[in-house]
Amino acid sequence: MSVISMKQLLEAGVHFGHQTRRWNPKMAPYIFTERNGIYIIDLQKTVKKVEQAYNFIREVAAEGKDVIFVGTKKQAQEAIQEEAVRCDMHFVNNRWLGGMLTNFSTIKGRIRTLEELEQMEQDGTFEVLPKKEVIKLKLEEEKLEKNLGGIKNLNANNVGAMFVVDPRKEKNAISEAKILGIPVVAIVDTNCDPDEVDYVIPGNDDAIRAVKLITAKMADAVIEGRQGEQLAE
């Protein structure tokens, strides 16, 4: 029983690559054919690659390590947040701030500011402050929540894998993962460089359904791995 079926991939449109003029020749092994100026991805390879990525993510989770989900393009934002929350992992879906992993102590300071602002809102401090100041503080809180809300509980030393939608868009995140020796799993479309990624999942990174399907599978792998970890205890 494979992790994902050809039918699921087809229905979600995972096989649609980019236009033929926008391609990376390194993706040639994953291309099945070309139709109407668009590359069609070889889904038999995608099935195998999803399985490899799934097994790897499951192992990472079973070892008690964390996975960080990264996807800041519009088509990925919702799936990245929903699936990371579902499997109780960390996510970045608005903007990758430089140093999120490599300079985590600075980022941790910003997270503390966010937590302090949340505390002020909850304990009624906002109610006694001048209105102008409250507006300013709320804007700051919203901005921090957007960028850091998904990594509030992150321990940067315990990240065992990074899952990425569109390595071209998330090159900063990937380069930080590389510096720290964190393996990268990614949905890689026909216009991306697969060499940047440790576990390549060839597929459409522009269709919401395609992104959701594969991201959900990675979240399933985390959940399965964590159950294994609990059983081992």
UniProtKB/Swiss-Prot annotation:
Glycoprotein in keyword set: no
Keywords: Ribonucleoprotein, Ribosomal protein
PROSITE patterns (UniProt xref): RIBOSOMAL_S2_1
Gene Ontology MF terms: structural constituent of ribosome
Residue ranges that the Swiss-Prot or TrEMBL entry lists as coiled coil: none
This protein's record includes keyword Transmembrane helix: no
Gene Ontology CC: cytosolic small ribosomal subunit
GO biological process: translation
NCBIfam families: rpsB_bact
Family indicated by similarity: Belongs to the universal ribosomal protein uS2 family.
Name this protein carries in UniProt: Small ribosomal subunit protein uS2
Organism: Clostridium tetani (strain Massachusetts / E88)
